[in-house]
A protein has these predicted regions:
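Glycine-rich, basic loop-to-helix element that forms the pyrophosphate-binding segment
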Residues: 41-55
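Short beta-strand-to-loop acidic/aromatic patch adjacent to the donor-nucleotide binding site
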Residues: 59-71
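A short beta-strand-loop structural module common to alpha/beta enzyme folds
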Residues: 30-42
């Protein structure tokens, strides 16, 4: 049976959205929904929650939350047809490898990146992995989840994270609260972003440390929660003080 797929995006650059998604042959057959964010420029996390709050869960669907500049370069339907519905999926995520103190971030999954204005040549980000490899979080560019999982646990995005780290946090919260795993779903795609982390992103880190005082999750450009070294020091101090 061909799976029902709903692709939702928050859009400010209509022309780019038309190129990457609405006019993309690989998105044919999917239910394309978007919100024009030019007038109000609401938080992406808020827009995603608005979509979820208005969704008819009586009509189950795979949900794809992706940026307006995320270009699918192969059809999703064959990949989702027999995919378990009890996990979160994305084309590129992150985890940690190695032993302390040499533990480091590793990308899982591989996509192309390209400058938003089309200049230059695309470059490859990440590394190839076998399908369903476990990740800690996914990049915000694309998250895939079945509506039945959203409905079962009433999953929502944290609106304190307006434009950054909202997908990474979604993965972290799903894991901490409900034990939901994040698994890499490799497919060909190009992210027409070419952007680098900004100061706004890093301003969220104190909030996330308070939110996850006893957990740490690897993201593509930072850590969510309590950094590994700090976690080790706090545990050592507590043990020393007999707590």
């Amino acid at each position: 049976m061909i799976p029902i797929i709903t692709i939702f995006s928050v859009v400010r650059d209509i022309e780019l959205y038309n190129t990457c998604i609405r006019g993309n042959v690989f998105c044919c057959g999917a239910n394309l929904q978007f919100v024009d964010n030019n007038a109000e420029n609401k938080a992406i996390s808020t827009r995603y929650n608005d979509f979820l709050n208005s969704f008819d869960f009586g009509k189950p669907s795979w949900m794809v939350f992706c940026h307006e500049d995320f270009e699918f370069r192969e059809p999703l339907a064959p990949l989702l047809e027999s995919l378990p519905r009890d996990a979160l999926y994305g084309p590129i995520g992150c985890t940690r490898k190695g032993l302390f103190p040499f533990r480091h971030q590793v990308f899982l999954g591989q996509i192309e990146e390209m400058n938003r204005d089309g200049s230059g040549k695309p470059w490859t980000v990440g590394r190839r992995v076998v399908p369903l490899t476990k990740a800690e979080t996914f990049d915000c560019c694309c998250l895939i989840v079945h509506s039945s999982l959203i409905e079962k646990y009433n999953l929502r995005f944290d609106e304190e994270l307006a434009f950054d780290l909202y997908v990474e946090d979604f993965c972290a919260m799903a894991k901490v609260k409900h034990g939901i795993k994040s698994r890499v779903l490799p497919f060909k795609a190009t992210h027409h972003s070419g952007s680098k982390p900004n100061d706004r992103l890093y301003r969220h880190l104190p909030y996330l440390r308070n939110k996850y005082p006893h957990n740490c999750f690897c993201a593509s450009c930072t850590y969510l929660g309590t950094p590994p070294l700090a976690m080790r020091f706090e545990r050592w101090l507590a043990k020393l003080m007999g707590h």
